[in-house]
Amino acid sequence: MLTIISYFLFLIGALTLALVLFIGLNKIQLI
């Protein structure tokens, strides 16, 4: 049970980081 929760949190963190990097790259390209 604990491993599933930690894996889920890791997945959310990875998706959030990817989203932030994607938005940052788009802002750099727009400028």
Swiss-Prot record:
It comes from the Eukaryota. Coiled coil: none annotated. One of its GO terms (cellular component) is cytochrome b6f complex. Keywords: Chloroplast, Electron transport, Membrane, Photosynthesis, Plastid, Thylakoid, Transmembrane, Transmembrane helix, Transport. It is found in: Plastid, Chloroplast thylakoid membrane. One of its GO terms (biological process) is photosynthesis. It is a single-pass membrane protein. Signal peptide: none annotated. InterPro entries: Cyt_b6/f_cplx_su6. Disulfide bonds: none annotated. The chain crosses the membrane at residues 4-24. One of its GO terms (molecular function) is electron transporter, transferring electrons within cytochrome b6/f complex of photosystem II activity. Component of the cytochrome b6-f complex, which mediates electron transfer between photosystem II (PSII) and photosystem I (PSI), cyclic electron flow around PSI, and state transitions. PetL is important for photoautotrophic growth as well as for electron transfer efficiency and stability of the cytochrome b6-f complex. The 4 large subunits of the cytochrome b6-f complex are cytochrome b6, subunit IV (17 kDa polypeptide, PetD), cytochrome f and the Rieske protein, while the 4 small subunits are PetG, PetL, PetM and PetN. The complex functions as a dimer. Belongs to the PetL family. This is Cytochrome b6-f complex subunit 6. The gene is petL.
